[in-house]
């Protein structure tokens, strides 16, 4: 009888603990370290953006120096300014908050209070610029690619901070962070990685470490029309 009571007590403790742990998991459309998110779920536009602004036209930016590459994620060559605009990330920050980030490719994020791991759920409507779907496999591919062949700054951070990454489904991916590292900013770090198309790199046998004037396939709002090297 005593054994049965002990078993029931242990079971109740386990179930209570499990419920508490589940209650401590946060599901949100964004994340902020300092204070609450400014924008609610499904917000239509940022407060400093004019949704009725004229579409089309021409815009010019300037930058110091010259360039001979449109690949900003390799040590080879000198990448042109704004050569990263062809790619999107899971999360995107805003200009009117200190450190908030909202789902871009990701629809929502799930994480515990200690931020020891994070699950990203991707939007089903996100496509690469060639019309192919962007899935969690592309996110995993991009993470591994940057960890193995990316800039030293990417490699160092991903190697030190991330314990593992695993696919849950076509639309879900989980990152588990190393126990011994500070975790406050790690969700933002992973959420800010550029996402590449695994199929594009495989089908075209693209060498990620090579300098090139042809940007890889991305899901961003821009594609390259032409480039004048050094101008």
Report the location of each language-model feature.
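Bacterial N-terminal signal peptides
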Residues: 9-18
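Short, intrinsically disordered, charge-balanced linker/junction segments flanking boundaries
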Residues: 18-21, 223-231
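Aromatic- and charge-enriched surface segment that lines or borders ligand/interaction sites
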Residues: 49-54, 75-82, 108-152, 168, ...
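Short, solvent-exposed loop/turn and secondary-structure capping segments
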Residues: 71-74, 132, 185-189
């Amino acid at each position: 009888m005593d054994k049965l009571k002990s078993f029931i007590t242990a079971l109740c403790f386990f179930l209570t603990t499990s419920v508490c742990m589940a209650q401590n998991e946060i599901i949100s459309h964004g994340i902020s370290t300092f204070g609450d998110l400014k924008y609610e779920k499904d917000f239509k536009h940022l407060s400093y953006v004019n949704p009725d602004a004229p579409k089309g036209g021409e815009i010019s930016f300037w930058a110091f120096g010259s360039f001979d590459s449109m690949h900003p994620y390799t040590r080879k060559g000198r990448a042109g300014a704004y050569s990263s605009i062809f790619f999107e990330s899971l999360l995107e920050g805003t200009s009117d908050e200190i450190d908030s980030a909202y789902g871009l490719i990701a629809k929502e994020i799930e994480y515990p209070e200690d931020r020891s791991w994070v699950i990203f759920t991707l939007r089903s409507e996100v496509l690469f610029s060639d019309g192919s779907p962007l899935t969690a496999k592309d996110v995993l591919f991009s993470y591994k690619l940057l960890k193995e062949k990316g800039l030293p700054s990417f490699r160092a951070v991903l190697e030190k901070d991330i314990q593992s990454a695993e696919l849950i489904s076509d639309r879900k991916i989980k990152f588990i962070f190393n126990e011994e590292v500070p975790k406050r900013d790690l969700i933002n770090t992973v959420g800010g990685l550029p996402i590449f198309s695994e199929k594009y790199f495989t089908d075209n046998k693209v060498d990620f470490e090579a300098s090139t004037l042809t940007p890889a396939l991305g899901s961003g709002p821009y594609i390259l029309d032409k480039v004048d090297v050094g101008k």
